[in-house]
């Protein structure tokens, strides 16, 4: 982008508006992050299981209604043609929502890449943000017998979040570019890292506030276990805190020689085709880089496992350990805080202090993470340990949070070393699709296992297997070779 061509009379306007745009971007993080951290990760899976149990029947006698404290219940679907475990109901819904989200995100990415207008992207953010917030709000108003509507609203909310996530990520480099002007690439990278980090911090801080308020709201409810009021609060938070985006985000005069694409409904098909073609181009580029392929295979495996550990552990704690909604929200807060600390201190301790290469740091984090499903498996052998008590879940919440935060920080840093300069957007979109794609498979497989055994503890075997299999994959990664290949491709 050329900044010399910007008219002189707008020179004072550009940095001021750039700062306003970045403030608007912070509000995007602040408003939407509680949905994914609180609602998707904790509240919605628990509510799905709860609705399944309320409308379910006993496993050993389908003529008897399921009682709240019954251990094994199944939910009759489609007039009793299909009976699924109440935990599987939540897992299948999550898997399906990520599938639709992935398809929608790939399709929308073409529109985002082609239509660079900030005003247009603002409208997309506000539209899908409003749809997602209202879907979340309506979940909080459902009757317990509306168990077909609940997964539909969960899918709509998750798909909406996926779209605004893509649009929000695409706006950050544009805003930073206007802010730094003609400064060198190093300055751009530093500013991007700082602003991105602040946005993530605001998002996590927002999620923490929502979680704390949720505990108070659930405590004040009649049965002290009303998750719907917490979900309704998340929807209200998302809806209200996105309002400043409408006033802060605004177009900035660009180089008049730069080709502009204005969105038209007539070209929607072409935009969607462009999104899928871009994914295909990313795959073709990735095939030229052996270590990128190795990394993405390994990432598919560990991302699948660690994402699924969260939903599995939450459902396990509710169905097997009988933990209350307040217990589980507290567990979620502990995990989130430890993830924030892990993201900061794990790279600092292992990479900077101990001078370990990022590849080894990642392998250490995987081994650390594998302790979680391994400990769950010991419950088949021992009577008093192996996730038999509530306090064990809190300890594993700390353990899991550290591993999750460390993995998020290290994985992106390691992958960035393997990416050719100038093609970052292409390869990180592939990274994102790999991440989302893995989240389809894990919950689906765990759901099938739980449906077959009606014991969600068996899921820990599969999760442990995933983590162990990823170790030789990442051991085969050659970072120096990957850097050389990336440099060669960047000159092509």
Curated annotation (Swiss-Prot):
Q: Name one GO biological process term.
A: amino acid transmembrane export from vacuole
Provide the topology term for how it sits in the membrane: Multi-pass membrane protein
Keywords in UniProt for this one?
Amino-acid transport, Autophagy, Glycoprotein, Membrane, Transmembrane, Transmembrane helix, Transport, Vacuole
What's a single GO CC term here? vacuolar membrane
Quote the subcellular location field of this record.
Vacuole membrane
Give the transmembrane ranges: 27-47, 92-112, 124-144, 161-181, 199-219, 229-249, 292-312, 326-346, 362-382, 391-411, 430-450, 459-479
Q: Name one Pfam family in it.
A: ATG22
Molecular functions (GO terms): transmembrane transporter activity
Q: Which InterPro entries match?
A: Atg22 (IPR044738), Atg22-like (IPR024671), ATG22/LtaA_families (IPR050495), MFS_dom (IPR020846), MFS_trans_sf (IPR036259)
Annotated glycan sites? 158
Q: Which cysteine pairs are covalently linked by disulfides here?
A: none
Q: Its family?
A: Belongs to the ATG22 family.
This chain's function reads: Vacuolar effluxer which mediate the efflux of amino acids resulting from autophagic degradation. The release of autophagic amino acids allows the maintenance of protein synthesis and viability during nitrogen starvation.
**What is this protein identified as?**
Autophagy-related protein 22
The species this protein was found in: Kluyveromyces lactis (strain ATCC 8585 / CBS 2359 / DSM 70799 / NBRC 1267 / NRRL Y-1140 / WM37)
Recite the lineage of the species: Eukaryota, Fungi, Dikarya, Ascomycota, Saccharomycotina
Coding gene? ATG22
């Amino acid at each position: 982008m050329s900044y010399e061509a910007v008219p002189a009379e707008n020179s004072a306007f550009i940095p001021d508006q750039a700062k306003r745009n970045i403030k608007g971007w912070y509000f995007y993080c602040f408003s939407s992050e509680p949905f994914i951290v609180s609602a998707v990760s904790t509240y919605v899976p628990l509510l799905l299981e709860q609705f399944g149990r309320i409308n379910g029947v006993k496993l050993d006698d389908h003529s008897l209604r399921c009682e709240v404290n019954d251990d094994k219940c199944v939910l009759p679907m489609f007039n009793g043609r299909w009976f699924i475990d109440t935990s599987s109901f939540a897992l299948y819904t999550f898997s399906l929502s990520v599938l639709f989200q992935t398809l929608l995100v790939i399709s929308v990415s073409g529109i985002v890449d082609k239509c660079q207008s900030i005003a247009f992207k603002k409208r997309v953010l506000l539209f899908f943000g409003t749809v997602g917030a209202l879907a979340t709000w309506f979940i909080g108003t459902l009757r317990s017998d509306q168990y077909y509507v609940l997964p539909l609203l969960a899918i709509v909310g998750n798909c909406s979040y996926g779209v605004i996530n893509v649009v929000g990520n695409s706006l950050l480099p544009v805003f930073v570019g206007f802010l730094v002007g003609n400064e060198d690439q190093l300055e751009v990278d530093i500013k991007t890292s700082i602003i991105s980090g602040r946005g993530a911090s605001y998002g996590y801080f927002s999620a923490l506030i929502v979680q704390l308020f949720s505990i108070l709201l659930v405590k004040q409810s009649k049965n002290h276990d009303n998750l719907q009021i917490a979900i309704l609060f998340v929807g209200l938070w998302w809806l209200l805190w996105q309002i400043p985006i409408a006033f802060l985000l605004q177009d900035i005069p660009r180089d008049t020689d730069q080709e502009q694409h204005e969105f038209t409904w007539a070209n929607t098909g072409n935009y969607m085709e462009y999104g899928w073609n871009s994914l295909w181009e990313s795959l073709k580029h990735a095939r030229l880089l052996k270590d990128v392929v190795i990394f993405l295979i390994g990432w598919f495996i560990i991302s699948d496992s660690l994402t699924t550990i969260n939903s599995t552990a939450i459902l396990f704690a509710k169905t097997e350990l009988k933990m209350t909604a307040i217990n589980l929200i507290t567990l979620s807060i502990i995990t989130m805080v430890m993830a924030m600390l892990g993201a900061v201190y794990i790279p600092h301790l292992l990479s900077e202090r101990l001078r370990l290469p990022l590849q080894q740091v990642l392998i250490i984090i995987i081994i650390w993470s594998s302790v979680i499903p391994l400990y769950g498996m010991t419950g088949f052998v021992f009577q008093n340990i192996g996730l038999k008590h509530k306090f064990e879940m809190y300890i594993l919440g700390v353990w899991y949070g550290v591993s999750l935060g460390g993995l998020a920080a290290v994985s992106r840093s390691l992958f960035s070393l393997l990416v050719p300069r100038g093609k970052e957007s292409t390869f990180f979109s592939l990274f994102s699709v790999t991440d989302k794609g893995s989240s389809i498979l894990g919950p689906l497989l765990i759901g099938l296992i739980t449906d077959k055994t009606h014991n969600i503890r068996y899921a820990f075997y599969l999760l442990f297997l995933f983590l162990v299999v990823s170790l030789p994959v990442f051991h085969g990664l050659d970072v120096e070779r990957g850097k050389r290949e990336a440099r060669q491709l960047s000159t092509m």
